[in-house]
Amino acid sequence: MRAFVVTGPCEAGVQDVADPQPRPGQVVVDVARVGVCGTDVEFYKGDMAYLHNGSAQYPLRLGHEWCGTVGSVGEGVDSWWLGRRVTGDTMLGCGHCHRCTSGRQHVCADRYEIGVRHGWPGALAERLPVPVTALHELPDSIDDTAGALIEPGGNALRAALASGAEPGRRVLVWGSGTIGLLAVQFAVAQGADVDVVGHHEETLAMARSFGARRATLSDEGIEGIYDSVIDATNNSSVPADALALVEPGGRVVYIGLASEPSLIDTRLMVLADVTAVGILSASPAMQGVIEYFASGRVDPRPLVAATVPLAETAAILAGRRPSDAGPGPKMLIDPHAG
């Protein structure tokens, strides 16, 4: 089969690799769509921290935001799964430690991460092996475009829930990339009064169309104070700035990751009785996202700028956008095209 393989910093291409065979407890999925995210870009450029702490090494097969159809099943897997449209969890815990047995496999110390950690091959390929325990079935009301956005949606839904979004609550989402815009949609769906700050007028316009009250360019400054602030940026200065914008007794939700450490004056947090929450992984919220997407309460598809063939993946990771791309921040790959 064909797979996209990164062999070194900014060195990558499509290769012919062996077809995966399902091991006991696994299925092999025929991949329909794959989302490209910032983690993939960091791996492609050689900046990802996992490359420097031993959690990942080249060659790499990327892709952890995906959907597809189960094409084969391994020993011990119910044949009911054959032909089912699915997406799946990125985080594959050991299944035995106290974190896994308490439902926190996404922070298992020995976890694999599909297309990210400890060599589990990613979805930027025609087929993908996945443990059946990681699968989530997709209803017909969720098409392939939306299906590839379940995983980032899980991160965003967790952020919105952690913010306490509800009618009358003032929520600021800082960042208008994929996660930020999805967080806007979920917070609005939960009834919150949502403002957004970001770098690009095109994505801020999308935020307004999703129901944000105000959407402001970051260089214009931020006015007001909020019950909750969601940091969905990769800017190391934003965590401290977010703390300065939250109401005493409020909440700050950190879901963005900067490439260098960020610093917060915890004295301000204590004296204002602020709760800070960190969000890692979509795992606990993926089924909830499926329900939101299936019902139409949240529609992620406007976020997709374009869908391109597998052969164009390297160009997308290098920052190229097709001339006919829409205004959204998300690029999708069709592994069977091109």
Locate the predicted segments by residue:
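C-terminal hydrophobic helical "lid"/dimerization subdomain
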Residues: 1, 240, 283, 287-338
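Glycine-rich beta-strand-centered segment in the early N-terminal region that forms part
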Residues: 20-34, 49-98, 139-141
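Residue-level recognition of short, solvent-exposed, well-ordered loop/turn junctions
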Residues: 23, 81-82, 166, 247, ...
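NAD(P)H dinucleotide-binding glycine-rich loop of Rossmann-like/cofactor-binding domains
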Residues: 64, 94-174
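Mid-domain Rossmann-like dinucleotide-binding core that forms the NAD(H)/NADP(H) cofactor-binding site
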Residues: 140-219
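Glycine-rich cofactor phosphate-binding loops and adjacent beta1-alpha1 units
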Residues: 163, 195, 201, 205-275
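Short strand-turn motif at the edge of the Rossmann-like AdoMet-binding core
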Residues: 255-259, 279-282, 308
